[in-house]
Amino acid sequence: MPSDFTPIFIPGLILTADLFAPQLVGLRTPLPPRVANTLAHDSLTDMAEEALALVDGPVLPMGLSMGGYVAMEMARLAPERLVGIALLNTAHKADDAARREQRMATIKMAQSDRFRGVTRHLLKSFLSPAALGDESIVARVMAMAATVGRENFVLQQHAILGRRDQTDTLRSLQVPGLVLCGSLDTLTPPARSHEMAALLPHSRLLILDQIGHLSSLEAPQAVTDALNALIDDI
């Protein structure tokens, strides 16, 4: 494996680079990490193409939630560019009918000038009960959501609605992988991570106890350590 690869962090829905602030300073890599742009796109493919264009040469996509969808799309588009992949609190299959209805409802709510209410609603599924009681984490998520804004939130939701099943992508990926999830994640439950780890030929599965959907904020050191362990395997 090449030693000059670039890690690319990919934020989730309604989130920014601050999602990975602890990991951006704690990652041990030969080249500085980059953060993909997930704004102003209504297509995961467009997000993935822009992320791949950030640098020349090998890359290590590391995505959380929607960022994981983008990471898998990067793997589908350019598997030869990847030296590894980190899939945090994410899923490889498209939404079922019930989840699609929920997603459409949040789009309508955001479009009706109730965007801040959407953010407050999402907090309950983003964070574990303990993290919901941590004012600093809640404030951080709310600040990221305000930065992303209503228009980008709607675009991102449409991008997610259009995502494909990445079963074949994962099954054919011949690079080291990390699949990580929180035990209290209700948006992408641990069962999804078990499925992805079973598909990836060279993967490590890590379920963080008592952690919710935003693992990089709730368990920053554990996530950083897991990412560094993946890098050591490359």
For each feature predicted by the language model, list its residue ranges:
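Catalytic histidine neighborhood in serine/cysteine hydrolases
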Residues: 194-213
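Conserved HGGG/HGGXW glycine-rich cap/lid loop of the alpha/beta-hydrolase fold
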Residues: 1-45, 49, 64
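Conserved alpha/beta-hydrolase catalytic His-Asp/Glu region
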Residues: 95-98, 113-171
